[in-house]
Amino acid sequence: METVTEEETKEGIEEVEQPPPRAKYTSHILTTTKIQTPVRIEYDPMKDDPPPAIITPSYEPLWKKNEHWGDRCDPPVLHDETEFIRIYGQNNNGISESTGLNYDDTFKHMKEANADIFCINETHADKMNAKNNRVLESSRRRMFRSKDSQYCNLVTSSSIAPITKYTKPGGNMMGICGSLVSRMRRRIEDKYGRWCGFALLGKDNREIIVLTAYNVPQETPAGDDTLHAQQTSLYLLDGEVDPNPRKNFIRDLHTLVKATKDNNQDLILMGDFNEVVGDDPKMMAKVLMAGDLTDVHAHKHGQAHIATYIRGRRRVDYCFVSPRILDHVLRCGFEAFHARK
């Protein structure tokens, strides 16, 4: 077998021009897309809906929502219980006026709610004013003594301090209706206008004390006719030096609640206490401990950051009950603001 060297190849073979070597890979055709700058659209907030880019979900706390909270206690919901007592509380921030129409409206709402006991805080009614008493009594007769209505007993409280106007800051009212009227043993009133209520006779001959209360929000008088100023003047007449109406409310309510427990009486305490109960251990928390009272709404539904004052963000209205009453609470809740108009 012969071999051919490189020199022999070059001399014996004619060289032919070769095409350039082909690449060992396949070329790819690249396509490019022109990226255009988006055109900015002018957004007119007075005419256009907000574009999606600026809509961000946000958490709305409970105190901002005007919604029902807790159980719904409308009569159709309660048709399955054979016997129950419905207690309804409200802070109207003033219902006293010379025509009695506001009283009529309030009583109408209480009848529509089928309230057996109703509690109204801040009536702005002056119990020392004879005309106001006549207007209130006339309204009660119109709304509760007609043929299609049940009877109602009322108790009210306001400070005994004199003022020059028809309306008087503060004031409380409670009504008991229907068959409960026959169980009334006595009315409970307070000359400082802090609370009022009834002592009712239970089925086991044990008294049930039902109270509605209102504590002043201010630490200073802030005016000549405010409830703070009224109570301060009365405490001074009683011989107290530098009285504090807010603290005196706690002091005297503590005494009343403790006496109720010592007398083996059951207690239902409702009202506007103008504090977040529990924030200050020297205020309403002290009263609850004295009577072994429980917040029924927190007991049933847990603690929640809800507002019970339409221009506020805190819960200042409560219903407290003694242990034996707590065992019989069926439902409880807060209606939305202006739910009854």
Regions found by a protein language model. Name each.
Residues 1-341:
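A shared catalytic/ligand-binding motif for oxyanion handling
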